[in-house]
């Protein structure tokens, strides 16, 4: 994995190499093994390299034989050897053994039809000198990020927003609607923190015609088509096919010319990956886990149980290491927010960053279990949405009365977290529908609470739910929720966190469950194969039961939680008082000093406001990081 950046001047000015090199500076941690730049006519392509495959000859930007096609590429193509063989038969000539060069020739052969042939994760830019076109592309799941902006004079792109900010034409105006949405969800679900900066969506490509300066974005992967056309297959045959695909995905992700390991939690997904990887590796498998001092959040015992169970499949042994989270190091959070270039308040970014740094001392590549919950209906909200949908036969007026009556019986003094808070969010869903129902379940900070501590800078903001239920992407039924998460939560939260944390440590993170063949098969399965009678991830746990310790499959899922409430009453108490009431958020009008102080006081008095406070703190850190 690497960092890419570049720009195309749309006027007659030749590109300045120093601008490109400046854009690469914030991405040194993404690619510590080398830097490359290429100026070709109006186009400037740059690259920071983390060497994983073909260590000696894979430097970028890279071109074809005659220099008419250039690429800068971030990611891994796992079937590149197969593609290389096929392209050789068609007359293509290669100078390296790298997957990057395969992409160049695949583009020559198939143009924008090339994506159907790829197995892997990627974000890349290809400049075609002959046609005067620039192509940007991002993988189906959105594992690798890619941002861009366009003005009348320039089109620029990069793996990170801080890299884009180094371009003199960067449009700095903030997207306040995106920041408003962030305060509810803890991530930005659509767009970016900047009004004129775009994020290339997963499974999409952008083609810019330099002759006409027109850019068009198209989707090459449409998961809703698979979701709507379910396979006619027996459960037994589906289990066999799933095992074959996941095994292949794990085997491909074990290919590397550097040391690799596995991230192991106390859950099902990573236990499956660890068991399969242990079975396939030719050396001792290194597994890494995170632990907390706070027992409620600590998974070290269940992670150790998973490691012990996986050890029986290891042909060459298994080494398990555990890292305990240090809550005192707030600098980790500030660094990650600055590197990401946007506010991001999924608190598990902190332990994930510490885990990546811990693992990087021994390995360069790590496998994880991201994506299984979205593919196989692992989240509680999927069941909650199904149960709530059963109330839709009642008249809307009656449902609203029921909601009000039930919620009035549930005390509200406990704050945003805990079982009572979850119950309130669930029962409010009886009186709602579609996106409003979904957001009521997943939003940690509701509209009314936000308005209590936000200032005039957020006046006129639309409710977050209006951003979701659109004509292009209607929300639909409860069965569509995983598709919705594929567009928003997975790429914008889970994978953004994984990319930011791993790249900060120069570590490549791979997830077999995000293999395109696994995803497409999972999406096309009947829903009762994935969830039945409260058994979530049914087909996954049944298929790989031998790799799971007894009882794990039915154990209640524990999210990757962080003890924020305790930290805000302990190690981070003074941090809130020092940073929030008179910080950049208050100066910009985004926060109300009185509202913030009241929020802090409520939390210290026992009403859990940790989600709202953490989102506010992160937004403050972001605003502080972009001060002139």
Language model regions located:
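N-terminal glutamine amidotransferase
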Residues: 1-76, 105-224, 247-251, 274-280, ...
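ATP-dependent adenylate-handling active sites, centered on carboxylate activation for C-N bond formation
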Residues: 7-21, 89, 109, 129-155, ...
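Short Ser/Thr-interspersed hydrophobic loop/turn segments at strand-loop and sheet-helix junctions
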Residues: 46-56, 124, 140, 256, ...
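Short active-site loop/helix that positions an aromatic residue
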Residues: 83-84, 521
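Structural motif
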Residues: 91-98, 169, 173-174, 237, ...
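Short, hydrophobic/amphipathic alpha-helical patches that form generic packing surfaces
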Residues: 105-108, 178-185, 484-492, 612-626
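PAPS-dependent sulfotransferase catalytic core
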Residues: 548-606
